[in-house]
């Protein structure tokens, strides 16, 4: 009996320790691949989406590839930001569209955590640049380990004058063919403006950039970052 109680104590302690190591997600990101319909332009897509009556989510962004990873010429990503799964489940609405089509059957759901202290993405603008890098958590490590190392890196960059907002997103629902569950992450950086992110990239390229996984991050198989131009479609808070 004492052994069972001791085991339960250890399990409870380990869960509490994990909870203290990593903050809860700041938001839920639901990402969907979308395509501009024949005869339409991306500008028309943005105009149509901005005129739609969408009151449920916190924010909606359309991200158009600039330096993508094999994206089709008419492809873009719709990112819808919610508080959590309950917020999504009680407010989600698929609005009919004319100028674009989205693959709503293959949405991906990401627990999103903000890194560092910068919170000034899209500062005075509704368009900015975003980089995203896909990585996989190393076996034997957790999102808490990844968060801590990435957060330390973000704080160090901010101390050097970096104005970008950094995030790490952790996939928990959606397509992830050929990988272990809950290992896929995206490291995201959003500029306070297009020029702001460009300056940040210039600063990173001034020194010894290195190769492979970001230094001290317990992740593997990191891809080169993709660059998108991100348009605010709606912000409800």
Regions found by a protein language model. Give the residues of each.
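Short S/T/G/P-rich N-terminal loop/turn motif that feeds into the first structured element of a domain
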Residues: 19-237
């Amino acid at each position: 009996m004492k052994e069972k109680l001791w085991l339960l104590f250890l399990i409870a302690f380990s869960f509490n320790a994990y909870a203290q190591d990593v903050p809860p997600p700041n938001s839920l990101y639901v990402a969907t691949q979308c395509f501009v319909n024949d005869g339409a332009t991306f500008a028309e897509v943005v105009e149509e989406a901005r005129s739609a009556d969408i009151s449920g989510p916190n924010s909606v962004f359309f991200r158009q590839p600039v330096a993508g990873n094999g994206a089709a010429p008419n492809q873009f990503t719709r990112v819808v930001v919610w508080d959590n799964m309950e917020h999504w489940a009680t407010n989600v609405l698929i609005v009919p569209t004319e100028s674009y089509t989205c693959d709503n059957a293959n949405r991906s759901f990401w627990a999103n955590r903000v890194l560092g202290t910068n919170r000034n993405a899209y500062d005075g603008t509704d368009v900015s640049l975003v980089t995203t890098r896909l990585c996989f958590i190393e076996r034997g490590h957790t999102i808490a380990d990844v968060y801590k190392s990435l957060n330390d890196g973000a704080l160090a960059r901010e101390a050097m004058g970096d104005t970008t907002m950094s995030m790490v997103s952790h996939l928990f629902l959606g397509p992830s063919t050929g990988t272990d569950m809950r290992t896929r992450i995206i490291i995201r950086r959003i500029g306070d403006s297009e020029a702001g992110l460009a300056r940040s990239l210039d600063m990173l390229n001034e020194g010894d950039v290195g190769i492979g996984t970001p230094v001290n991050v317990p992740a593997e198989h990191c891809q080169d970052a993709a660059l998108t131009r991100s348009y605010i479609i709606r912000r409800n808070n």
